Regions:
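Beta-rich accessory regions
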Residues: 10-16, 263-495
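Beta-rich carbohydrate-recognition and catalytic domains
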Residues: 1-171, 176-220, 234-283, 306-356, ...
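Short, well-structured alpha-helical interface segments that form or flank functional binding sites
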Residues: 38, 225, 287
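Short gly/pro-enriched beta-turn/loop segments at secondary-structure junctions
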Residues: 169, 223-225, 234, 259, ...
Length: 495
């Protein structure tokens, strides 16, 4: 790796860090050192720490040639910033070091597997852009410094089976299976504009061979599938993909960029994955490109980019960086669904506690002690025929608010941040089909300074959105059209 280009990028990042105060960042969500970030990458455990890398353009708040930023954590909540890990520089990645994953090798080194995007010609195409291709590459390091593999790329367009694109071939997710072999799933667009997930295999993580097509979109479930993840949890195999150009299906799937998970059976001998069901992974506004890992204590933990692509070109005025990650989430499989919960470590940061039991709500009501922008709050709503609508206002004052509303007749939960202060907000509202569980709708709401993550009915559904509301707007209120009954448990989170 070119020491000079990496040194320049690291020095620039260090200078930019001085411009951004801790108060301008979230308390417990990962952000870039400066500039732009998107997909989480290289999520892994190495040398007694969690490592998270991310797609990174440190030089501006807009997407640009992708670098890899880097943070570490002991507990998945508070993160230490390390020098950025990779810069685009070689012929095979001079357009960008795109998304990938990480794993510890048997010899104790840390391996990063990523997509290198390189120019193949200096003659522009019809759209004025220079043609590129995408290949899979490696970098090996000690947890701080990484060297790109001298024989990169290790998987090229020549390894793509017939009918596949050499241009859209990206986002390798690597793991080591019980048979001692390394495997990687890679997203690939087909010649007809659809997508498929390719499976590759290696004895040493350096020399790879194509195995099979694991699954494909087949003119359904969007076009290009990005950022695949494949794992087993609670006896069920799960394939997670982030489709582009998704078509809506009622309130189940939403239009545009999305994230879905496909559950099924997987034969580890024949490598045949038989799909059984498809569900949305998050039904909110800002959630994309999730990546998971298995923790040393056996939990499956996932993190995602907390941003919507359609809004990403409209950076709010005055923002000194753009993009953040979700809170890591524990994943389980129960009753035919993936269940998501905030990682349990967040509970170690709980402070002041307020509890209300069976409070009747009609007109707009403020509960003493229930306010703030950094909190962990659970609201249990009894679903009866005594109200037509129930609303929670968050991050509110006389000018701003964002709302969570439940309609018990339609069984629809609605998010609305049109009054949040996010100018030019293309996606500002989302409706989600939510059925009561045991006569109640339970909402666990995790707020940070610039986000809201909602875990619905014990994590059977989730909804995520960012907020660019001034921090002074920290009121919370409850209201009902009719009479509703709620219980509230609210913890302030302290850091």
């Amino acid at each position: 790796m070119s020491k000079e280009k990496l040194k320049k990028a690291r020095e620039f990042e260090q200078e930019q860090l001085k411009r951004i105060s801790p108060e301008e960042r979230p308390c417990y969500h990962v952000t870039g050192g400066s500039g732009w970030i998107n997909d989480p990458n290289g999520f892994s455990f190495y040398k007694d720490e969690y490592h998270l890398f991310y797609q990174y353009h440190p030089y501006s708040n807009e997407w640009g040639p992708m670098h890899w930023g880097h943070v570490t954590s002991k507990d998945l909540i508070t993160w230490e910033r390390l020098p950025l890990a990779m810069v685009p520089e070689e012929a095979y990645d001079n357009f960008g070091c795109f998304s990938g994953s990480g794993i510890e090798l048997s010899d104790g080194r840390h391996l990063l597997m990523y997509t290198g995007v390189g120019y193949v010609s200096d003659i522009p195409m019809a759209n004025g852009e220079l043609p590129t291709h995408q290949t899979q590459c490696l970098a090996v390091g000690d947890g701080t410094d990484y060297e790109k593999y001298e024989k990169n790329p290790v998987i090229t367009g020549e390894d793509v089976p017939a009918g596949g694109s050499k241009v859209d071939f990206r986002d390798p997710k690597i793991w080591k299976d019980e048979d001692g072999f390394y495997y990687a799933v890679v997203a690939n667009m087909t010649e007809d504009g659809n997508s498929r997930i390719l499976l590759f295999k290696s004895a040493d993580a350096f020399q790879w061979q194509y195995v099979c097509v694991l699954d494909h979109s087949d003119e359904k479930l969007g076009k290009m599938w990005e950022c695949p993840d494949f794992y087993e949890v609670d006896g069920k195999h799960v394939l997670v993909v982030s489709p582009m150009a998704m078509m809506p299906e009622g309130l189940k799937f939403h239009v545009g960029h999305s994230v879905i998970y496909l559950t099924g059976t997987y034969d580890k001998k024949t490598h045949q994955f038989i799909r059984e069901d498809v569900q949305p992974l998050d039904s909110g506004i800002d959630f994309y490109a999730p990546q998971s890992m298995q923790t040393p204590d056996g939990r499956r933990v996932m993190i995602a980019w907390m941003q919507a692509w359609p809004n990403s070109k409209f950076v709010p005025d005055g923002v000194k960086y753009f993009g953040q990650m979700t809170l890591p989430r524990e994943i389980n499989y129960r009753n035919g669904k993936l269940i998501q919960q905030p990682v349990r470590e967040i509970e170690n940061y709980r402070g002041e506690y307020v509890h209300y039991e069976n409070v009747e709500i009609s007109d707009e009501t403020v509960l003493n002690g229930v306010d703030g922008r950094v909190l962990d709050m659970t609201v249990k709503l009894k679903v009866t025929d005594t109200f037509k609508k129930f609303t929670i206002k968050l991050a509110a004052d006389e000018t701003y608010d964002s709302t969570i509303t439940y309609d018990p007749v339609r069984e629809v939960l609605s998010l609305d941040r049109s009054r949040s202060g996010y100018m030019y907000d293309i996606l500002h509202k989302r409706d989600i089909q939510v059925k009561p569980a045991g006569g109640e709708v339970t909402l666990r709401i995790l707020m940070d300074r610039f986000s809201v993550e909602i875990f619905i009915n014990d994590g059977s559904q989730t909804a995520t959105m960012v907020l660019f509301t001034p921090q002074e707007a920290d009121n919370i209120s409850f209201a009902a059209d009719g009479k509703a009954q709620i219980s509230v448990d609210k913890y302030a989170l302290t850091f």
